[in-house]
Regions:
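Flexible glycine/acidic-rich beta-alpha junction loops that bind and position SAM and/or redox cofactors
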Residues: 12-13, 99-103, 150, 209, ...
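Catalytic cores of alpha/beta
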Residues: 105-108, 354-369
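Glycine-rich beta-alpha loop elements in corrinoid/cobalamin-binding modules
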Residues: 2, 29-165, 379, 385
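Radical SAM [4Fe-4S] cluster-binding motif and immediate context
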Residues: 172-347, 357, 365
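Glycine- and acidic-residue-enriched helix-capping/strand-helix junction motifs
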Residues: 12-23
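Radical SAM enzyme core and accessory elements
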Residues: 2-5, 15, 31, 36, ...
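N-terminal [4Fe-4S]-dependent radical SAM core
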Residues: 11, 142, 148-200
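Glycine-enriched alpha-helix->loop->beta-strand junction motifs that scaffold or abut catalytic
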Residues: 112-114, 298-304, 371-373
Length: 503
């Protein structure tokens, strides 16, 4: 069967475009099953999906099914894409983070153009559905699948499948991506072309930690790691066969088991696969690190590590964020990473429930103390499926009109708490203050950045992002909205004079 696998365009500030790795896994699984997948990533396409649907019809080889993935802010775009595909007679299937949290919503009568919904990791079950449709057999309910019955009622299997043996999955179908249209992952090293051949790799799925702000519905709470042999084989393929210029490890927590992480580093070194720079895109868990691990990572080609610091107040970290780490462990991780010669990046969150001016000031002070090469200060967004969302629903109110309001870069999903303490306007002021004090009010940092080639090659996008970041986007009434998050790959590093004009 000819199948389109599609991803709506995430409307973020960042000009960087990264490969949607999940579609690569689905495509490889379908192809191994004898089907013919085509990947449509709206983020890098110049034409709408119907262009390819019509082109295939004209060639006499029409597509029969479309599978669309969507996070919460993009579910509206996914519905629109499904409606378009249905008008051409395609079977429509939805999956991804939002569908895992709210699977039945997309099968309501107003979405009669959606045929099937999957939750959880759907590589195997999606293939089984396509096989069934190809053979003309009646569709039976599969694990994690939701569909309509004969009378139009929604029938559901509420399990959320997790693939135990990740080695059983084929490597992502990178040959189906238009690699030249994607950008490098981060401003990683001087001299790396912006449109370098950048690939991501997933060495594990799942995370056992219970951070209240984190939504991890698809991969779940159970951590499952690929074997070191399997990871090294894919790494070798990326370096030697696909000629990667950089690699990004995108696990939620790839270093959960330090012995495995160290073994992987030793193998990369021993097999000469340490010549391509790489980074930990989603960061590392500080309480699963030591100096030896960072030294091995450096020798294995790693250039930068990120850490989820989140907050500088011990009470907030322990009782609200529930990160499962201490400030002492945070400080040790930064110290050891720097001692190993790695660049560091810190992720900080402003605006969790119970946040006060004092706790936010503690976060700013900690960021200045740790002094990472890059700092990303984020505004908390109460995504459905998170403990934070439940906390606010129980003790406050969320001001969001529709799912697009949950776009983390727009900050339209503001909320208030009934405790009389939380102040969303104060949160935004302190968040902006954090960026000013970290990036603008320390001349030595400005001069350090200006001395690097990457500063000047990134200048156009930095200016554009800075203006949009500090001025915000205008809503339909012409008012400036507050942006909720700077993209991790686009930290504000411009000179003080440029940003002062934007403030």
């Amino acid at each position: 069967m000819r199948v389109i696998l599609a991803s709506p365009e995430a409307k973020v500030w960042s000009e960087r475009k990264h490969i949607p790795l999940g579609l690569g896994y689905l495509a490889a699984t379908l192809r191994d099953g004898g089907h013919e997948p085509f990947i449509y990533d709206a983020a890098i396409e110049d034409v709408p999906v119907e262009f390819y649907i019509e082109e295939a019809e004209q060639q006499g080889k029409p597509y029969e099914l479309i599978g669309i993935t969507a996070a919460t802010p993009l579910i509206g775009d996914a519905w629109q894409m499904a409606q378009t595909a249905k008008s051409y007679g395609l079977t429509t299937v939805l999956g991804g983070p939002h569908l895992t949290i709210m699977p039945r919503e997309s099968l309501e009568p107003r979405h009669d153009y959606v045929d099937y919904v999957f939750k959880g990791e759907a590589e195997h079950t999606f293939l089984e559905l396509v096989d069934t449709l190809q053979a003309g057999r009646p569709v039976q309910l599969l694990p994690g699948m939701h569909m309509r019955g004969r009378d139009g009622e929604i029938i559901s299997d509420y399990s959320s499948p997790m693939i135990e043996n990740l080695d059983s999955l084929p490597f992502p179908a990178h040959d189906l991506f238009k690699i030249d249209r994607y950008t490098n992952l981060q401003p990683l090293t001087d001299g790396l072309d912006r449109h370098a051949r950048s690939f991501t790799i997933l060495t594990s799925r799942g995370c056992p930690y219970k951070c209240t702000f984190c939504s991890k519905p698809v991969t779940g709470d159970t951590w499952r790691g690929r074997s070191v042999d399997n990871v090294v084989a894919e790494w070798r393929w990326l370096v030697q066969d696909l000629h990667a210029s950089e690699i990004g490890v995108t696990d939620d927590i790839w270093n959960l088991k330090m012995d495995r992480a160290k073994e992987l580093m030793r193998r990369l070194i021993a097999e000469g696969l340490n010549t391509v720079p790489w980074t930990t895109v989603h960061g590392m868990k500080v309480n699963h690190t030591d100096l030896e691990l960072f030294q091995l990572m450096k020798a294995a080609g790693c250039k930068r590590v990120g850490f989820g610091v989140e907050n500088g107040d011990p009470w907030m970290l322990r009782n609200v964020i529930r990160k499962g780490q201490t400030l002492e462990q945070v400080r040790d991780a930064f110290k050891n990473a720097k001692a190993a010669g790695l660049q560091t990046m810190g992720f900080f969150i402003f605006g969790m429930p119970n946040e006060t001016e004092e706790t936010m000031e503690a976060t700013i002070q900690l960021a200045l103390e740790l002094d990472p090469d890059l700092a990303n200060f984020m505004l908390a967004a109460p995504f459905p499926g998170t403990k934070m969302y439940d906390m606010i629903r129980e003790g406050g109110e969320i001001f969001a009109n529709d799912w697009p309001d949950y776009a983390i870069h727009e900050q339209r999903s503001r909320f208030t708490m009934n405790d009389g303490i939380y102040n969303s306007d104060l949160v935004v002021r302190k968040w902006r203050d954090a960026y000013r004090r970290f990036y603008l009010y320390r001349p030595e940092r400005v001069w350090e950045k200006m001395s690097k080639k990457s500063f000047w090659t990134e200048m156009p996008s930095t200016i554009s992002n800075a203006r949009r970041f500090f001025l915000g986007n205008k809503d339909q009434n012409g008012h400036h909205g507050h942006n909720g998050r700077v993209n991790p790959e686009e930290p504000v590093t411009s000179v003080k004079g440029i940003l002062d004009r934007a403030l």
